[in-house]
A protein has these predicted regions:
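Short aromatic-glycine-(Arg/Gly/Cys) micro-motifs in beta-strand/loop hairpins
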Residues: 19-44
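Mixed-charge, Lys/Arg-enriched low-complexity segments
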Residues: 39-79
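Negatively charged, low-complexity tracts enriched in Asp/Glu with abundant Ser/Thr
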Residues: 1-16, 75
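Short, low-complexity, intrinsically disordered N-terminal segments
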Residues: 12-24, 56
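Low-complexity, intrinsically disordered short peptide segments enriched in small/polar/basic residues
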Residues: 16-19, 28, 50, 61
Length: 79
């Protein structure tokens, strides 16, 4: 499963960069959260590994905009 979301307000991640959108990706190792420092970025700037998707929702649901989580297809089958 993959879902992405845009943040209501950019989140500062260091002295120069802000996170504008995020994507979650469930994997056999856990759930990856990819963080993008540009609205049109296709390659993430940062990532985090969570044990459960509910932890991502708990951390991020209040930060995403009114469009909510948007489902997208997995580009490749998981090995």
């Amino acid at each position: 499963m993959r879902k992405y979301a845009y943040l209501k307000n950019p989140q500062k991640c260091n002295d120069k960069e802000y996170i504008y959108k995020i994507m979650l990706h469930t994997h056999k190792e856990g759930v990856y959260l990819y963080e993008y420092c540009s609205l049109d970025a296709i390659i993430c700037s940062y990532d985090q590994l969570y044990f459960d998707v509910s932890d991502i929702y708990e951390d991020w649901n209040s930060e995403i905009d009114e469009r909510g989580w948007i489902d997208i297809d997995d580009p490749l089958p998981e090995n």
